């Protein structure tokens, strides 16, 4: 699953060092929504990583 534009934006802002509170303020969002979007994005990244590792293992 691909990351949404919002998920990418939130991860980018976190990488720049902004807190959930600052991101929520900057994007005019509620803080629980920022946390949920970040959590969903990280889950998608972990699933994609696991898929790649599985595909790599099948090639061996």
Regions found by a protein language model. Give the residues of each.
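Short helix-to-turn junction characteristic of helix-turn-helix DNA-binding domains
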Residues: 13-18
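Hydrophobic positions on the alpha-helical face of helix-turn-helix-like DNA-binding modules
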Residues: 10, 23-25, 34
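Short, basic, alpha-helical segments at the C-terminal edge of helix-turn-helix-like DNA-binding modules
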Residues: 50-60
């Amino acid at each position: 699953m691909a990351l949404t534009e919002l998920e990418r934006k939130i991860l980018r802002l976190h990488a720049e060092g902004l807190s959930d509170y600052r991101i929520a303020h900057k994007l005019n969002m509620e803080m629980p929504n920022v946390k949920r979007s970040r959590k969903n994005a990280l889950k998608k990244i972990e699933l994609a990583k696991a898929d790649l590792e599985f595909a790599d293992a099948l090639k061996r």
